[in-house]
Curated annotation (Swiss-Prot):
GO terms for biological process: DNA-templated transcription termination; transcription antitermination. This is Transcription antitermination protein NusB. The keyword Transcription regulation applies. The gene is nusB. Keywords: RNA-binding, Transcription, Transcription antitermination, Transcription regulation. The keyword Transcription applies. Belongs to the NusB family. SUPFAM superfamilies: NusB-like (SSF48013). PANTHER family: ANTITERMINATION NUSB DOMAIN-CONTAINING PROTEIN, N UTILIZATION SUBSTANCE PROTEIN B-RELATED. Disulfide bonds: none annotated. One of its GO terms (cellular component) is cytosol. NCBIfam families: nusB.
């Protein structure tokens, strides 16, 4: 398994923990990392993802909700939602990561940690976001 996959899985676990506690998100992340320190070779990408999602969660959640036809975020499984948050963060803030890679990683990790339906659910929402962002970028280039 690649380093980035392992960093994404650790970011998922940390965000799951952050969601389950009443502590401020960055404090909860620090506590998670005290108990489960990320390996040095994963730390940079892990922290970029985990802190990036936490610091941009409102924007990311709005984007997910816009593309999750008739699904409210609170009804989604924590695994599926946090995987989509990680992928959406990569879409918006990690131009070096191809969006298809982010989608495939979220699907594969969702199949491992989520339910039997996680892969298809994650794929549907992330693909919609990917298409939407692609259209916005094309429109920007035409200007």
């Amino acid at each position: 398994m690649g380093k980035r996959r392992r960093a994404r899985e650790l970011a998922l676990q940390s965000l799951f923990y952050v969601d389950s506690t009443s502590a401020p998100p960055l404090e909860a992340l620090d506590l998670f990392c005290q108990n489960f320190p990320p390996p040095k070779d994963l730390a940079q990408f892990f922290y970029e993802l985990a802190k990036g999602v936490i610091n941009n969660q409102d924007e990311i959640d709005r984007l997910i909700e816009q593309h999750s036809n008739n699904w409210k975020l609170y009804r989604m499984s924590a695994v599926d939602l946090n995987l989509m948050r990680i992928a959406a963060y990569e879409f918006l803030f990690c131009p070096d990561v191809p969006r298809r890679v982010s989608i495939n990683e979220a699907i594969d990790i969702g199949k491992r940690f989520g339910t039997a339906e996680s892969g298809a659910f994650i794929n549907g929402i992330l693909d919609s976001i990917h298409l939407h962002l692609g259209k916005e970028e094309k429109a920007e280039k035409k200007r």
